[in-house]
């Protein structure tokens, strides 16, 4: 096995391209234990006998100036774009992007291309609701979590009728979806009934951007018996399927609805979350998987009390890397010290960006477009705060 590594400091320039060959070290230190003062350590592990090409970034959790954010493919509305393009859209106030990996699985379809399959919270905004897969989120104290999240989204009419709804997704033939301007220019729906919602007169009540674990009061501004309603600033649209028209026939302009974005567990104070799954490591032990376990390119996120671990395994390239099964991936993460780890979207989506360049070899020959990503940034210095400079 050939192991190569690079230590990264926030003050270092972007790494130079090394093609399929791992870059050579320039620092004489133990590759398995990065200096905590530097905060980051990248390793490229080549296991030639399989073969595997494994890219791992170890992040010191004591660095309070490091922070995770989620990105979207487009500046306005759902869609698809390459990871390197999403990095370019990171706002200056977040800080300097240091590393990024692809995020959640996403819906592939003309009208709803780029709809994340699971949960996404971006800067405290509930962009996409959870599904039946595991999610990763960071609570208000900075502690990471990963488990299934149950949506309890519900609207209630003035006469006491209640029903559940989804958020920013394709509406089914038996349900309701709440659309926000973050989704795009319009709802892309066909048929049914759509209620254009506006804030009530209370300017102090919660409104947009939509947040998790909150209660909202909304007034029906207009009722449309057509689909594809425009999504205007400071308005939401509640889209009802055709089968529900009779049930909610008494909803007219002026009606006031109660909306809840509750979840279990409660995510009301969460700033960053992203969907994925399945879980790979729990309590320091690899999760057990049954049935056929094929090898594919993989992306994963793990952690312990001291470090985060971002990992991408290349795959579907017989001369470089064949990919990993879930059990192989889980075992590898345990050996690296993870006590918790979650799988993210893989296959052609698996992409690893560090300090200005894509470090891995995506299986389609280049970056694939994706719906969202998880980005690590170094927060800007607080004006007047002592300057801390990483050693060269």
Residue ranges of each PLM-predicted region?
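Gly/Ser/Thr/Pro-rich low-complexity, intrinsically disordered segments
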Residues: 10-392
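Bacterial N-terminal signal peptides
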Residues: 1-10
